Every structure is written in C-alpha cells, then in structure tokens.
C-alpha cells in the first residue's frame, strides 16, 4: 500500500444502506440511516435515545481545506495522513472530559472505527459559537485597522497582536446563509452580536430566549476545560469554534448539546507554550497550514479576497503542494492528538476497507 492509499480522501461513496442523499461537507460525510436501521441499532446497541430518533453514520476524511478550498499534494496525495483519525480522537477525548465535568452531552452515540461516529439527528443552532482568549486572526486584523467594536464588544485601547485578552470573549458568526434577519447580511460567516441573536433568537434556531445564556455557558465552560487540559501539556488554547443543537431525550424534553467537533486543530488555534513564552508563535493547528499557503503562493490576496474565489478554486485545483508540507501538517495533527489523548493515532493501510468490514459485520449496514 502506498502513502496515498492510506489517506481517506473520498468518503461519500461507501455502500452504506440509506434512503436519503449523502450529505458531503468539507471534511465529513453524513449517511442518514433508514428508519428501520435506526430503530434496530437503538434497540440492539442500547443507545440512550428515544426509539424513533433518526441516526446517521458520520465518516470523516483526511481532506485538508483552507480558505474554503480543498488542497492536495504531490504523488497523488489527496489528503493528510492521519488527519481524520486525529481529529476524531481529539474530539472524543474532549467530549468525554466534558461529560466528566458535568457539561452537556454530544451528538455521538457510538464510535465503531477511528474515522466513524454514529450520531443522533439534532436541530442545529445557526451560530458559529466562537470563543477567544487571545487577540489574533480576524479580530487582530480588524483591531489593527482601528476597529474597536467586534461582534458588539468594545475592545480596550493598547492591545498588541497575540496578547492574552482581559476576558474570555464570545464572538459569534452566522452558520450558513441566513435570510430575513434585520441587520444581518445574507452571507456565510458574518460576525454578529449577542443583541442580534437576542432580537432574532428563533431565526437563529434557539427554542427559548434563555437558551442563549446556556449556550454561552456551555461554550465558556467547554473552553475552560480544554484550556486547562492543554495547559497541562504546555499548549495554549487561543480560540475555538463550537457548534450546538437540540435533541429530544427519552422523556420528550429538548436539550442543548455539543455538535460536530470540539477543540481540534481544525476548529481551534493552539500554540506551543514554550515558544509563546519566548515571544514566538508556533502553531499546532491548521493555522500553520494557512500561513504556509500564504507564503507559498506569489499572490496571497487570492486566498484572502472573497471577490477572487474562482481564481482561488483554480489555484487549489491545479497545484500539487510539496509532500513535505503535507507531512508537516500530518505531524502537527497526530502530534497534538497523541499529546491530548496520551495514545498513538492508528493509521490503517486501507481505512475504507476497514470501515466497510466493521459496518457490515458489527452493524449490518452495508448493502
């Protein structure tokens, strides 16, 4: 098997029994199970959800996206070796820690394989729940241009790039394109304020006004749990994005849960603690890959300017990135995962075959 064979790049063509179209995201694909299979698994596997809960198989890939494009490497390498397994392992670890600390549940019911989650269907909150402990990235870019109000929060004068903020800040943005909300442009990833959410809480998917307080508490509490654990291995939790949704429990009550992934190098910035104390930034997240791309291509504006999206897509499609750059990302992701979990990340030679075998033999879900 070659290195390219060990990468799961295409994850939306598995022969999983479903009666709905496969939903393909940038990194994960979701296969909604039939009602009969959902009910069977809930009963035979003992999942603690109502018997009529829709279930899905969520399969992560090793694809690498940045600036809203998928990139690939030399030698037919269509993704990052170990990336998918690393992301899932990190999220699994944090979700377990959240449960131990009495925080909310996640959408994950079962983990058949390092690349696979069995999840319950949730009603998503249409907010990218972003939490920041340091001023960097888009917040710093806005601040350096003189902006002092960010997502409705007034920032103090005199802040310097990459410094720790006086408070842990929640700076939400829209999840997807939302229409008909006063003062909120119908664009993806638009910064919004808490007052925007309060005035239109149902349009953002909140069932009750007071659930805004709950989502903020779960966001901050989750951030603090991860930040403390990362500090114990001398890593700095800089900022992150969480996602939330509602599920119905066995008693028929709605409850807010964590969704998607949490605290990963894809959804967060993580800095090396020793380097930060020396006044340097050593990225242990996808931000390092983004910086590589900005330096690698002669015209970085293509990657930053939303008006040049066709050029950006062509750039990603037509350029094989150096193998060493791809492997550096692999080392970053697997390294963080091994530090966080304390265990080596499995790198199966043929992950797709492994997934099909397990889902056939242990779950009877393969056509």
From Swiss-Prot:
A Pfam family assignment: SAICAR_synt
Gene: purC
Top-rank EC class of the record's enzyme: ligase
SUPFAM superfamilies: SAICAR synthase-like
Identification of the protein by name: Phosphoribosylaminoimidazole-succinocarboxamide synthase
Keyword Cell membrane tagged: no
Entry-linked InterPro entries: SAICAR_synt/ADE2_N (IPR028923), SAICAR_synthase_Vibrio-typ (IPR014106), SAICAR_synthetase_CS (IPR018236)
Gene Ontology CC: cytoplasm
UniProt GO MF annotations: ATP binding; phosphoribosylaminoimidazolesuccinocarboxamide synthase activity
CDD domains: SAICAR_synt_Sc (cd01414)
């Amino acid at each position: 098997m070659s290195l390219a064979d060990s990468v799961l790049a295409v994850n939306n063509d598995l022969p999983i029994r479903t009666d709905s179209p496969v939903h393909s995201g940038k990194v994960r694909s979701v296969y909604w199970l039939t009602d009969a299979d959902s009910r069977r698994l809930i009963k035979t596997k003992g999942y603690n959800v109502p018997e009529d809960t829709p279930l899905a198989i969520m399969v992560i890939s090793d694809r690498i996206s940045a600036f809203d494009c998928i990139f690939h490497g030399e030698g037919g390498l269509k993704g990052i070796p170990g990336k998918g397994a690393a992301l899932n392992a990190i999220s699994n670890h944090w979700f377990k820690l959240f449960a131990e600390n009495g925080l909310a549940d996640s959408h994950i019911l079962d983990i058949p394989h390092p690349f696979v989650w069995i999840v319950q269907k949730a009603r998503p909150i249409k907010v990218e729940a972003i939490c920041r402990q340091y001023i960097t990235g888009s917040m710093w870019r806005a601040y350096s241009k003189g902006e002092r109000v960010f997502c409705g929060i007034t920032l103090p004068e005199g802040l310097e790039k990459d410094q720790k903020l006086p408070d842990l800040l929640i700076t939400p943005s829209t999840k997807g394109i939302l229409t008909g909300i006063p003062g909120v442009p119908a664009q993806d990833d638009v910064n919004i304020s808490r007052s925007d959410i309060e005035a239109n809480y149902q349009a953002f998917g909140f069932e009750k006004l007071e659930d805004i307080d709950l989502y903020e508490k779960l966001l901050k509490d989750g951030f603090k749990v991860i930040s403390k654990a990362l500090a114990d291995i001398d890593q700095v939790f800089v900022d992150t994005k969480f996602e939330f949704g509602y599920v119905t429990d066995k008693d028929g009550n709605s409850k807010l849960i964590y969704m998607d992934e949490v605290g990963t190098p894809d959804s967060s910035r993580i800095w090396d603690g020793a380097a930060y104390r020396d006044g340097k930034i050593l990225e242990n997240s996808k931000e390092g890959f983004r910086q590589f791309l900005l330096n690698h291509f002669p015209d970085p504006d293509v990657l930053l300017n939303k008006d040049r999206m066709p050029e950006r897509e062509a750039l990603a499609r037509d350029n094989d990135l150096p193998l060493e750059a791809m492997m550096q990302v692999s080392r970053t992701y697997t390294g963080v995962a091994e530090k966080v979990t304390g265990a080596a990340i499995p790198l199966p030679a043929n992950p797709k075959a492994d997934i099909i075998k397990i889902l056939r033999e242990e779950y009877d879900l393969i056509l």
